[in-house]
């Protein structure tokens, strides 16, 4: 019996890391991105723009068991965030990928929170209503959360670990902030991938 089938929508660095981890556990991995040349050879790649509704709908036949949505803004304005985060999830709903028999994990951002003064945030902290781009991300989250599917949302912040990277290079060169009390909220790419893979594995196990 084959393992679960995962479709990674917008498969960049994080998606590839997650897919490779799950592939070693017997999962079948399909990956959607504009260019498939950089995808791991273990993946079945589909060269599409996931923000193109018709292109995304054309792959409805894949019928995944699980979906990992790793979106990126398609521009710095609000419309770019809507195209990257909100609109594709609406399409996933129309093609049946948000039904109760599918598990969906979305990698979101802590940008959705209202806190801007360095305070602590939790899953229940207030969300911003003043940042239109963050609201567009929230709208994508809401589509997933209101769908029949099981849809955990991972709100990450400050990804690092892709070389060369500014944070790693600053540490290597001994560059420090002039503010000794400055706190940086970051997560390593491998850690985020481990979390996402762990969530998907638990979902597959019925947890």
Locations of regions flagged by a protein language model:
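Glycine-rich "substrate-gating" loop/helix at the edge of Rossmann-like oxidoreductase active sites
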Residues: 128-131, 157-158, 162, 179-187
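Glycine/proline-rich active-site loop of Rossmann-fold NAD(P)-dependent oxidoreductases
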Residues: 135-138, 147, 159-172, 198-207
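Catalytic helix-loop patch of NAD(P)-dependent Rossmann-fold dehydrogenases
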Residues: 117-154
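NAD(P)-cofactor binding segment of oxidoreductase domains
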Residues: 59-105, 139
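Conserved Rossmann-fold cofactor-binding substructure of NAD(P)-dependent oxidoreductases
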Residues: 43-65
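Conserved Rossmann-fold NAD(P)-dependent oxidoreductase catalytic core, especially the SDR/UDP-sugar
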Residues: 91-130
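N-terminal Rossmann-fold NAD(P) dinucleotide-binding loop
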Residues: 15-16
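Substrate-positioning beta->alpha
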Residues: 166-168, 178-205
């Amino acid at each position: 019996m084959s393992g679960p089938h995962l479709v990674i929508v917008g498969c960049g660095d994080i998606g590839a890391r997650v897919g490779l981890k799950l592939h070693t556990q017997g999962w079948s991995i399909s990956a959607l991105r504009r260019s498939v040349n950089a995808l791991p050879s273990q993946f079945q790649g589909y060269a599409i723009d996931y923000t193109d509704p018709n292109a995304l709908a054309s792959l409805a036949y894949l019928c995944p068991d699980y979906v990992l949505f790793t979106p990126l803004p398609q521009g710095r304005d609000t419309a770019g965030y809507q195209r990257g985060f909100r609109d594709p999830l609406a399409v996933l709903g129309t093609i049946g990928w948000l039904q109760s028999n599918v598990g969906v994990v979305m990698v979101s951002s802590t940008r959705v929170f209202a806190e801007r003064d360095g305070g602590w945030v939790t899953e229940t902290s207030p969300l911003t209503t003043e940042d239109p781009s963050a609201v567009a991300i929230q709208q994508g989250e809401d589509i997933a959360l209101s769908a029949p599917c099981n849809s955990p949302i991972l709100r990450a912040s400050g990804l690092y670990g892709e070389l060369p990277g500014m944070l790693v290079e600053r540490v290597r060169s001994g560059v420090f902030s002039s503010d000794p009390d400055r706190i940086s909220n970051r997560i390593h790419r491998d850690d985020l991938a481990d979390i996402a893979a762990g969530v998907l594995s638990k979902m597959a196990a019925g947890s």
